[in-house]
Amino acid sequence: MQHTTNIIHPSPLSLTGLYFYNLISGLILADVAIELHESSECEVPSSFKDFSDAAMKSGTAGNVIGAASLLINSCFLAFGISRAGHEFANILPGGLEPTIVAAAFATILAIASFTQTNRGLEKIANVAVMLLFSSFASLLLPSLANVADPIGTITYEGTNPDGLISTVSAAVPLILSSLTYQNIVPSITKLLDFDRTKSSVAITLGSFLPVAMYISWCYATLGGGVDNLTTSGAGAAALAAFSASALIGSCIACIMSLAEEYQSLTSTIFSDDEQSSVKDKFSIPAVILSVAPPTAVVLATECSDELGLGLLHFCGAIITPFLYGLLPTILYQTISKKDGESASSPSLQSCILASGAVGFIGQEIIHDVSQIIA
C-alpha cells in the first residue's frame, strides 16, 4: 500500500498532463496516417516500422524505429510474463515456482500465436478484454462505496520522504509507459476509413478511458475499499480474474505486435507464396523471435519484481518519449512536405509534444547523472 501511495497519489495534475500529452501524440499520428492515405491512396501499414517507412520514405529510419518498437514491446512482454509467473503461482494449487509458471505461460502463448490465425488471436484478446472490464467493474463499484474517508483520500499528501518532485519523477515514466496506445493509431484510422472526425473522437475517448480507470482504481485502493472487498471469496475471485485477463490480453497484444514487426523485418527470406499465407497467421520464426528473448530474461532473473519495474521505467523514460513524442513530430513534418517544398512551421501541438518528450528524456538523464555522482 505504501508503495502505491508514494508513486500514484500526489500527481493528479501530472495525470492530466500525461493524458493531454498522449492525446496530442495520438492525434498527430492519426493526421500522419490520414495524410499518407490521401496523398498516395495506398493501404496504410499496421506495422509501426512499415508505417514509418512509408511516411519517411527511408528504409534506414524505418529499421531504427522498428528496432525501438521491438525493444519497447519486448520490455512490456517481459514484464507481463514475469507478473504472470507470480500471479498464476498464487492462484494455482501445488505451490509452483514463479519461474516454472512463467515459462509455461510463455510457452502456451507462443503455441497459440503460431497455431491460431490473427483473427483467432484477436478473438482471444477480445474475450480477455471483456473479462477485464467486467471484473474491473465488479471490483471498482463496491470498492468506491467502501472508501471510509473520501475527502481524506483525495487530500492525502503521500509518505515519500524525498518530496513531491522525487515522487513525480519516479512515477511519470511508469504511468507514461502504462498509458501507451499510440502504436495502434494507424489501425484505428484504417478501421474508421481515415475519417478525421471519427478518428479524433475515438482517440480522445479511448485515451481518456485508461486514465479514468487508473484514477478510480488509485482512489479505491488508497481509500481501503479494494482491501475490504478482496477479503471475501467473491472479491478475491474478481481480483484474480482481473489480473489474469489483464496479463493474457496485454501479452497477446505484445506478441502480435512483435511478431508483425519481426515478420516485416524478416520478410525477404520468404517466397511470395509464403508471404501471402502469413498475412493471416504468424510464422513460427516470428513468434519464437518475439517470445524467446523476453522469456529468457525473465527466467535468468527468476521473475524479479525489480526487473519488471525497471523495464517499465526504462520504456517510459527513454523509449516512449522517443517513439511517441519526437517521432510523431518528425513524421508530421515529413509528410507535410509538398513535392520538394519545405515543410510548414511546426504547429503548437507538435511543439508541445516535442518539448514534453525532450523534457521526459532530459529529466531522466539528469536523475541518472545525479544518482551516479551521489
Regions found by a protein language model. Name each.
Residues 3-39:
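Extracellular loop-to-transmembrane helix junctions
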Residues 4-7, 57, 86-96, 119-128, ...:
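Transmembrane helix-loop boundary segments of multi-pass membrane transporters
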Residues 24-94, 240-268, 325:
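Hydrophobic transmembrane alpha-helices that form the core helical bundles
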Residues 42-59, 205-250, 313, 317:
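TM-loop-TM module centered on a large, flexible mid-protein loop between adjacent transmembrane helices
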Residues 65-70, 90-117, 130, 178, ...:
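Transmembrane alpha-helical segments of multi-pass small-molecule transport proteins
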Residues 92-232:
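Helix-loop-helix junctions that connect adjacent transmembrane segments
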Residues 132-142, 247-258, 286-297, 301, ...:
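Hydrophobic alpha-helical segments of multi-pass membrane transport proteins
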Residues 304-374:
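A generic transmembrane alpha-helix motif of multi-pass inner-membrane proteins
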